[in-house]
Amino acid sequence: MISSLHRPTVARVDLEAIQANIDKIQRHLPKKVKTYAVVKANAYGHGAVAVSKAVEDQVDGYCVSNLDEALELRQAGIDKEILILGVILASELQLAIKHQLTITVASLEWLELAKKESVDFSQLHVHVKVDSGMGRIGVRSLAEANQLISILSDMGVQLDGIFTHFATADESDHAMFDKQLTFFKQLVEQLDKRPALVHASNSATSLWHSETIFSAIRLGIVIYGLNPSGNSLSLPCPLKEALSLESRLVHVKQIQAGDSVGYGASYVAAEPEYVGTLPIGYADGWTRNMQGFKVLVEGEFCDIIGRVSMDQLTIRLTKAYPIGTKVTLIGQQGKQVITATDVADYRGTINYEVLCLLSDRIPREY
């Protein structure tokens, strides 16, 4: 998708804030360990290449979701380790080897398919994924893990690491978390052959569960300045939200009592009022259910009225602002702030989703 560079809607990304967030988190950790920056999903909407380059001196490697995300970083000249967290097609192994990418191996069935590929397995770097209770991908028993590692060794593969992922690390109830941690610890301790790198810590566990820090951590949403729990748990160190979302008024008018605005005529004015139009809509990731939420105009909150359209939305203004007036959808104006978590709470979702949904139509400025 082509970025819409010729309309006044933009996501501004503060790379220095991301750098500062990483520094604060690393100083908070009880020990120095290998650090991966998680830049999957276009760095949670912040721009994978720009973020990866900005933090290159602070991290040991990167985590992405799939092969294409890894290739994007390599093609941008990023040469540090890249771990693909998802499962790639066995038929794509040669690409992973060619670009020196580390892949995840999650099952014996996949490994049998991989063995059929004509590649130099001695050049392949892998981490084994353990499903300790998340229920997505990974080996689910010590026997399966030992068998998989044995086959990988026989193939001559570079077995670099083993890892798991927690389902409830950002929740106050620790029962499921404790169950997963115990399972993973016992499995790792009993392996016939233990890889050098062991990691289980994502953003939430790095902040609130230092007992999960083995020899590496994977820092995701926290480096972008957001709380993994939303507002359920307090951050142990202050972070700065790195992304702000701005647009500008492209049309301003006065409507009268009884006039309607938007699809379905779902908003009807009760009295004369000023209405402004912004060039951003649900095709940009600002979803239809944001009707009734607020934006900031000159430091004052203004309501979104009418349904959010594909490309535009309308707001109720306190006066007739001139065309070109800046409007903040996420970020700070004056003393007022709208956070991605505020948006998420209104939508009934999580701050991760809010940022990841911001489409490529919105240019990122650094």
Swiss-Prot record:
GO CC annotations on file: cytosol
GO biological process terms held by the UniProt record: D-alanine biosynthetic process; peptidoglycan biosynthetic process
Pathway field: Amino-acid biosynthesis; D-alanine biosynthesis; D-alanine from L-alanine: step 1/1
Record field: catalytic activity: L-alanine = D-alanine
SUPFAM superfamilies referenced in this protein's UniProt entry, alphabetically: Alanine racemase C-terminal domain-like, PLP-binding barrel
Annotated catalytic residues: K40, Y263
One Pfam family this sequence matches: Ala_racemase_C
Gene3D superfamilies membership: Alanine racemase, Lyase, Ornithine Decarboxylase, Chain A, domain 1
An annotated Gene Ontology molecular function: pyridoxal phosphate binding
Signal peptide: none
N6-(pyridoxal phosphate)lysine: residues carrying this PTM: K40
SMART domains in the record: Ala_racemase_C
Cross-referenced InterPro entries: Ala_racemase (IPR000821), Ala_racemase/Decarboxylase_C (IPR009006), Ala_racemase_C (IPR011079), Ala_racemase_N (IPR001608), Ala_racemase_pyridoxalP-BS (IPR020622), PLP-binding_barrel (IPR029066)
Essential cofactor(s): pyridoxal 5'-phosphate
Binding positions for substrate per the UniProt entry: R136, M310
Assigned keywords, A-Z: Isomerase, Pyridoxal phosphate
Keyword Isomerase: yes
Cited NCBIfam families: alr
Alphabetical list of PANTHER family matching this protein: ALANINE RACEMASE (PTHR30511), ALANINE RACEMASE, CATABOLIC-RELATED (PTHR30511:SF0)
Protein role: Catalyzes the interconversion of L-alanine and D-alanine. May also act on other amino acids.
Protein name, as recorded: Alanine racemase
Organism: Streptococcus equi subsp. zooepidemicus (strain H70)
